[in-house]
Amino acid sequence: MTWHPHANRLKTFLLLVGMSAMIVFFGALFGRTALILAVLFAVGMNVYVYFNSDKLALRAMHAQPVSELQAPAMYRIVRELATSAHQPMPRLYISDTAAPNAFATGRNPRNAAVCCTTGILALLNERELRAVLGHELSHVYNRDILISCIAGALASVITALANMAMWAGMFGGNRDGQNPFALLLVSLLGPIAATVVRMAVSRSREYQADESGAVLTGDPLALASALRKISGGVQLAPLPPEPQLASQAHLMIANPFRAGERIGSLFSTHPPIEDRIRRLEQMARG
């Protein structure tokens, strides 16, 4: 079984550098004061999300904590995987929904939570469930919540500066030699570009979690099988496309919405299931 984590890490790094470059560009348009205000706003908002990510996600999914008596298989699998990775045991939750999915959240391994829906517990066999839980634990061990918040903070700065560009374009006229039409164009394209890059970061982290989760369990084909089942199950029982659920979609192991209910692949939080399965099958072949 081969594993090449460096490509995904490099891609994530380059995407974050690209977002930082966009901020420098916007900062050059508006000067230091506007840049500092935008950065302070974005950092403050995302620090809150970072420290409360578990509460926000669990509340959105109406997840309830479960004991070992209530979910013995889930506890046994997670304990085995955490022990093999020399990591603490996370809190375990179940969300009572037929939509087959799972997610992990929490800012570090000591504050982590893993949640499975009743739909995924009914759909998968134990080998596949182990693979899914390995994927979710890998998100925690790879510090993907932190990476997501960094990407979110950068995107928020770009959006805030783009809003300034919009107002400057509409009401600033030609002051300081600024072209109002150029400012309006930047204000439209900036947030779109930031969102595209942020979603690309999310997709890159999914590939990374697939690979590192498969290494943790030693069974990439089980994860491929689970993803195939989950993809079909989501078409039958998707999550409702509500705003509070859409904001947590990037945490799920697979896109929780039925195909066609969300925007195209550039704006998708997850890579195509077919690509993920193909990569896992290649890992298994070595």
From Swiss-Prot:
GO terms for cellular component: plasma membrane. It is a multi-pass membrane protein. CDD domains: M48B_HtpX_like. InterPro entries: HtpX_protease, Pept_M48_protease_HtpX, Peptidase_M48. Its EC number is 3.4.24.-. Keywords: Cell membrane, Hydrolase, Membrane, Metal-binding, Metalloprotease, Protease, Transmembrane, Transmembrane helix, Zinc. Binds 1 zinc ion per subunit. One of its GO terms (biological process) is proteolysis. It comes from the Bacteria. Zn(2+) binds at residues 135, 139, 206. The keyword Transmembrane applies. Pfam families: Peptidase_M48. The keyword Membrane applies. This is Protease HtpX homolog. The gene is htpX.
